[in-house]
Every structure is written in structure tokens, then in C-alpha cells.
Amino acid sequence: MTHTSSSNPRLDESRTIIAPTGTALTAKSWLTEAPLRMLMNNLHPDVAEHPHALVVYGGIGRAARNWQCYDKIVEVLTRLEDDETLLVQSGKPVGVFKTHTNAPRVLIANSNIVPHWANWEHFNELDKQGLMMYGQMTAGSWIYIGSQGIVQGTYETFVAMARQHFDGKAAGRWVLTGGLGGMGGAQPLAATMAGFSMLAVECDESRIDYRLRTGYVDRKATTLDEALAIIEESKQSGTPVSVGLLGNAADVYADIVQRGIVPDITTDQTSAHDPLNGYLPQGWSMEQAAEMRLKDEPAVVIAAKKSMAIQVQAMLDLQKSGSATVDYGNNIRQMALEEGVANAFDFPGFVPAYIRPLFCEGIGPFRWAALSGDPEDIYKTDQKVKELIPDNPHLHNWLDMARERIQFQGLPARICWVGLKDRARLGKAFNEMVKNGELKAPIVIGRDHLDSGSVASPNRETEGMMDGSDAVSDWPLLNALLNTASGATWVSLHHGGGVGMGFSQHSGMVIVCDGTDDAAERVGRVLHNDPATGVMRHADAGYDIAINCAKEQNLDLPMLSEPK
């Protein structure tokens, strides 16, 4: 049954989706209840950016293709048996097949297009015809947990930047950025947690207001003078503050250059990966952009990319003036390059500059959510992480700050960057906590697709690989296949997340800890094998940290000792 209230099958203003909580099952087991709740959680009004349109985050990253498909997915998950697998093709449930109890209950493929046709123009045509949807990374794979999902990764990046550029001292320094959407909205909180102040430019006032309500932004400004005065005050006091400035990023960045002001760090997290839907051209209102998207898509794209070129040129100018400038993975450099900014890639991406050593040890954005809906279940797992990893004060500090400063969105959840050495141990411990009743209901464990072995993205995660293998996308395919073989509860394989059509392929997995012995076996396999593929991928590329980690963890990599 469908409830759509307009001629657009993707829009239904009457819908409010909130996942069930507690121990009563809607589906036949926790293995199907879990994907059902996490799908619904992606569309919770406190989680999704535009839930009535099925948009979770990242421009047009959706949880389901349309409301009819959403309803059918829910219906199938409630009747799915524990030896059946649902196949989802770009947000549409297309088949249920008999498999076995250790197979995934759901297999998802989103936004995948044969490479020659893998561009926004062809995707948008398919999208209009109702043949495809954009899954982003965790939108269409049902494991988005709100802005917390990227806070720690952003925090780790800012900490690394403080260490690399400022001798570890962030006090009195500030960051210029753009974008306060589902991903970018994590930046202000991550910056202040790391000791920096931040000026974040956002063209949608409702996003600034939402980040204020949820504690991600401290102050709001409507003029650059007002925002800079707040930043100057924080520099003098040494107390970090974040400011959301209502404005256009291209305008503001160029104005800052014109004034001769140099931020300590410059970056950007606008949705530049999608010039049609994600970036507001200079001089345009939000209403004008929405209208033009319906009337003249090419004109919107042209205007957006011209504005991106102006913003990137300003970032290059700030870099020359001494600002530590970094691309935060939205492909804005590529867009500017296509508009004639020949040296757009003169500033690095954040992964090769600051994150890759972590990836070499399989360390990445491990996350879990409490299906009970009770925050106490998360606090208990926080404590378990501290018990099992007692000698990592940086991690303990993160968990303490997260509890104090991060508001849960939808189901209570936690993000925690750990790697190959720890993920399986933690997962099995969580499963045991469910088994013995310490936790009120099962836990789901997943991750971002932005992880060490699950993505090929030459302008982001795999930029500048030392062996030149940036564009080799066999690795995320192998990761998805191995997670399927290992018994993950649901596995996803996507294209275009983060950086847009034609620029990335990536995979995700989620595993349910339901307290059973079978779950313990599956958790052990999946949470070892998944990060191990990241160590394998980086060892194969020749990174010493990864090679040493592979040897320490006794990974069987047949070509490791052979010359390249």
C-alpha cells in the first residue's frame, strides 16, 4: 500500500518514519528486524535531511527508490525467513531467494552503472525514469547514524592537522569551511573537540538552526563581519567556538581572500560532488535553484561549477598565504579542474595527508547502534570498549567527549575508530553482553563505506596510492564478496558515494549481535575479515605499516613476500 500525497512517487509529506524500539519483534527474527529498524532509522526526522523525500544525506542520497518501494521493502522484511535473502536494486526490492542461515538476509546494489556511462547526465536520466536512485554511502545501505557518523573521522583529521602543522597546539587557531549538511554538519563539533574554532559557511539557514539545536554549532551569524568578530574573540580567549555563517561559500571565501585574512586551516564540505542538487551557485536563492532544477538542469550545473571554481581558486590563494588547505572528500577540486582551474589539485585530499596510516592497520569508522532504543546500552558498550582497549587514552578521551557532547539522532549509536586488532574482539564482547542480558536488545555493528578496504576513490580514499593503483576498484568488490561469504547480515555495493558519479566504487556491511552462538561465529568472521581486506589492500600497494600489520596479525597474503 502506498501513501504518496503528490504526483511525485518520492515525496510524501504525510509520512513520519520512526523505528520500533524494545524487544517486541515486527519481523520473524532479529536478523530481519535489524535491517528493518535501521532502514526506518535512516528516515527518522532527526536523522534524515529530507525524510519526506526519502533523502537521508549528501545531496540526494536516498534510503529507498520511492515510497512504493519503501513499503514493499518493509513488507518483505517482516515476512522474510532466516534462510532467505532479499535483493535490493537501487532502492527497489527485486527478489527473494532461498539461501541459508549464515547468508546475508539482504544484499544491496545501489547506483552502479557500466563505467562508460557512469556520469551524472546518464544517472539523472535513469533517475528521472524511476530506474535508479543515488545511495550515497550509508543512506542506501541503511546504516547512517546522523552526523556522529563522521564526527570522529573529522576530529581525527583535525587532531592530525594540529600535530602536523601546529606542534599539537590548536588553541587560538581557526578553521574556515563550507557546508553544514549531513556530513559537513559534523565539522564544527569535531573542530571544537580538537581545540580549534571554526567558521562554517552554509546557504540553507534551516541547516544552521538544526546544528544549533543539536549542539553541533555554537553561534549563528548573518554577516562575515559578525562571524569574524566571534572568531577573533575566541582567538583572544583561547576558548574554541564554532560559528555557522549564512552565506554562499564562493562569495565568502573570495571575500576573505580580498580582506587579506588567513585562516589557520581551510577546507570545504559542501555537496560539491553533485553540481545539480548539492551546490548553490553564486547570486542564486534557494528557491531560484529549486525552480531552475526543474526547468534547466544544464544551466544549474554550469553555474554551480563556475562558483566552485571561484571557491577553489580562493582556497588555493589561502594556501599560498599560509593556510593549511585540504580537500575533505567532496570532489570540489575535480569540479574546479573541469572549469579551468588547472592547479586545483595543488592542495591535498585529507586521506593521503592525514588518514592513510590508520587505514594501513585497518583502522576506520567502526559504528554500532542499540536496537533497544535505550542510551544505556550504548553507555555500557562504551565502557566495554574501554575495558578491552585499556591502553589507548586518545580513544578513551574520544568516548568521554562523545558521551558528553554528542546528542543521539534516532536510535542511540556510537562511532569509534578501531582496526583489525580490535573489531572482532569488541563485536564478540557485545554479542556476549546481549546473550547475558547486560544489554536490553541486540546491537548492530556496521561502518561507513569510507574505510580501509572497502572503497576505490582516486580523488578521496585512494588518492595518491604509492603504487599508482588509485582507480583499481577490484578491492571494494572483493570486500563485498568476502563479507557476503563471511555471513554479514546485510551487504551493499555502491557507486558514486562521496565524490559523485564516475569517481568511486565502495561497499558496506552490517552484522547483528543477537546473543546467539551462531552470531558469535559470524561476528568473529566478519569483523576480522572486513578490516583485514584493508590491511591486505594497503600491503599490496607497498605500505610498510600495512605489511607489518599483516605479519603481526598472521594474515595469509600469498604475494606479500614476492617482489612487485
Swiss-Prot record:
Record's superkingdom?
Bacteria
Where is the protein localized? Cytoplasm
Chief location: cytoplasm
What InterPro entries does this protein's entry cite?
Urocanase (IPR055351), Urocanase-like (IPR023637), Urocanase_C (IPR035401), Urocanase_central_sf (IPR038364), Urocanase_CS (IPR023636), Urocanase_N (IPR035400), Urocanase_Rossmann-like (IPR035085), Urocanase_sf (IPR036190)
- What is a single cellular component term in the Gene Ontology annotation? cytoplasm
Q: Enumerate the SUPFAM superfamilies for this protein.
A: Urocanase
BP GO terms, sorted: L-histidine catabolic process to glutamate and formamide; L-histidine catabolic process to glutamate and formate
Residues the record lists as binding NAD(+): 58-59, 136, 182-184, 202, 207, 248-249, 269-273, 279-280, 328, 498
Instruction: Name the UniProt key words of this record, in alphabetical order.
Output: Cytoplasm, Histidine metabolism, Lyase, NAD
- Kindly tell me the pathway this chain contributes to: Amino-acid degradation; L-histidine degradation into L-glutamate; N-formimidoyl-L-glutamate from L-histidine: step 2/3
Name the Pfam families on file: Urocanase (PF01175), Urocanase_C (PF17392), Urocanase_N (PF17391)
Query: What Enzyme Commission number(s) appear in the record?
Result: 4.2.1.49
The cofactors it requires, by name, are:
NAD(+)
Note describing how the cofactor binds? Binds 1 NAD(+) per subunit.
* Catalytic activities: 4-imidazolone-5-propanoate = trans-urocanate + H2O
Q: Which residues form the active site?
A: 416
One MF term in the entry's GO annotations:
urocanate hydratase activity
Instruction: State the function annotated in the UniProt record.
Output: Catalyzes the conversion of urocanate to 4-imidazolone-5-propionate.
Q: Would you identify the family this protein belongs to, as annotated? A: Belongs to the urocanase family.
What name has this protein been given in UniProt?
A: Urocanate hydratase
